[in-house]
């Protein structure tokens, strides 16, 4: 039995699939509210600012992620276990930037949904798949960093790269499975304004006439794609912090200087992944909170105030911006990636020359990697350290 909601005085929502009226005044926790159209639509200055922001996110994000992916595939020293996950993360971000972000920008230009029922389902599926790939990959990366800190010199099997590719593929499959219900329930609905004799279509991610389903959808999304993964990541980083603290206390006096360098190296690598996690948490929190507010507070969709409009725009832009910040976070944290990034950006031919092995400092965190020109797999520097630029001593193989 549908749970009827109070009807907005000047709007009626009807499903175009069954052409039956529903008294819900909401459209989607991700699409529109009354303040976006009609008399309450933003002025030309606001629209210009919105489109410029979206254009910057799309162009900068595509450029940054494309270069990151190119660096990974063209530079053998970057093809390591953690960097496979980081590249998978970039692929998910690139998918979102090429599809969902441009479509979202059309909401401010057109009076409704332009991409039909199939487009509604496909784009809903892509959006949630990309979010799942991001947060689940960060969770696996945190587990990988924990293992590297606890057992830094453990020799990994020769097929570690292949296994990591399989894990990355499983993350994509799992994300798609979680996104399927949203694709199934997504539908196009028509928003009718009797006062202006106007109708417009919008894509909703759940049956809009079912208030309970709206609440369940928002709550499950918040738990599965935010709270639970970040809680797991928090546990791993608590264990990492405890391990690093104990290793500092147990450093022998005669090896104080050398061991402290190893501990500092561990901290730098863990910090890289932690920065990516923090960026995800910061960028997606406002969007999740706004979705919960819209789903559990009926009158939220009738709020046509400028403040509500600004908060809505801010949460969406911040969420999409997460898809373009990771390459620049790596650029900031990694001298090696800075050089590779600049080389690819300015179309330099070939890879940058590798620095002399004897002149490079020790990085004690080891994972499996391949040495260029050989088929043997050895203990080597941690994959993220390739981005950080902490190659290894002469006696050790460098990624």
From Swiss-Prot:
Task: Tell me one GO molecular function of this protein.
Answer: bombesin receptor activity
Quote the InterPro entries the UniProt record gives.
Answer: Bombesin_rcpt_3, Bombsn_rcpt-like, GPCR_Rhodpsn, GPCR_Rhodpsn_7TM
Keywords linked to the UniProt accession: Cell membrane, Disulfide bond, G-protein coupled receptor, Glycoprotein, Lipoprotein, Membrane, Palmitate, Receptor, Transducer, Transmembrane, Transmembrane helix
Q: Which residues lie on this side of the membrane: Cytoplasmic?
A: 64-82, 144-163, 242-272, 334-399
| Tissue expression as described in the entry | Mainly in uteri of pregnant animals.
Lipid-attached positions, S-palmitoyl cysteine? 347
Description of how the protein assembles with itself and partners? Interacts with C6orf89.
Q: Which PANTHER family does its entry note?
A: BOMBESIN RECEPTOR SUBTYPE-3, LEUCOKININ RECEPTOR-RELATED
Q: What is the name listed in the Swiss-Prot or TrEMBL entry for this protein?
A: Bombesin receptor subtype-3
Annotated source species: Cavia porcellus
């Amino acid at each position: 039995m549908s749970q009827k909601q109070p009807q907005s005085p000047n709007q009626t929502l009807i499903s175009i699939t069954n052409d039956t009226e529903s008294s819900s005044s909401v459209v989607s926790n991700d699409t529109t509210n009354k303040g976006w159209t009609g008399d309450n639509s933003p002025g030309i200055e606001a629209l210009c600012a919105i489109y410029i922001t979206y254009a910057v996110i799309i162009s900068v994000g595509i450029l940054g992620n494309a270069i990151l992916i190119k660096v990974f595939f063209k530079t053998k020293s970057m093809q390591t276990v953690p960097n496979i996950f980081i590249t998978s993360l970039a692929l998910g971000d690139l998918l979102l930037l090429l599809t969902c972000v441009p479509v979202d920008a059309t909401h401010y230009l057109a009076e409704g949904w332009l991409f039909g029922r199939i487009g509604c389902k496909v784009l809903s599926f892509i959006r949630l798949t990309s979010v799942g790939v991001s947060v689940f990959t960060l969770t696996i990366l945190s587990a990988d960093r924990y293992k590297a800190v606890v057992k830094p010199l453990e020799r990994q099997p020769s097929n570690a790269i292949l296994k990591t590719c399989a894990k990355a593929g499983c993350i994509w499959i799992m994300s798609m499975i979680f996104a399927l219900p949203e694709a199934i329930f997504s539908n196009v609905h028509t928003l009718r304004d009797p006062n202006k004799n106007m109708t417009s279509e919008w894509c909703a991610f759940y049956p809009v006439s079912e208030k309970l389903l709206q609440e369940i959808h928002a709550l499950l999304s918040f738990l599965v794609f935010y709270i639970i993964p970040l809680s797991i990541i928090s546990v791993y980083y608590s264990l990492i912090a405890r391990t690093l603290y104990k290793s500092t206390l147990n450093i022998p006096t005669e090896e104080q200087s050398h061991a402290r360098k190893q501990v500092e190296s561990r901290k730098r690598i863990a910090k890289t992944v932690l920065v990516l996690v923090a960026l995800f948490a910061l960028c997606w929190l406002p969007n999740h909170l706004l979705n919960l507010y819209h789903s559990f507070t009926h009158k939220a969709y009738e709020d046509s105030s400028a403040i509500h409009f600004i908060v809505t725009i801010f949460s969406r832009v911040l969420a999409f911006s997460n898809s373009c910040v990771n390459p620049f976070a790596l650029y900031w944290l990694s001298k090696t990636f800075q050089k590779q990034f600049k080389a690819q950006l300015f179309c330099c031919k070939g890879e940058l020359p590798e620095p002399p092995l004897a002149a490079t400092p020790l990085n004690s965190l080891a994972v499996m990697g391949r040495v260029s020109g050989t088929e043997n797999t050895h203990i080597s520097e941690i994959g993220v350290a390739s981005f950080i630029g902490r190659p290894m001593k002469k006696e050790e193989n460098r990624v």
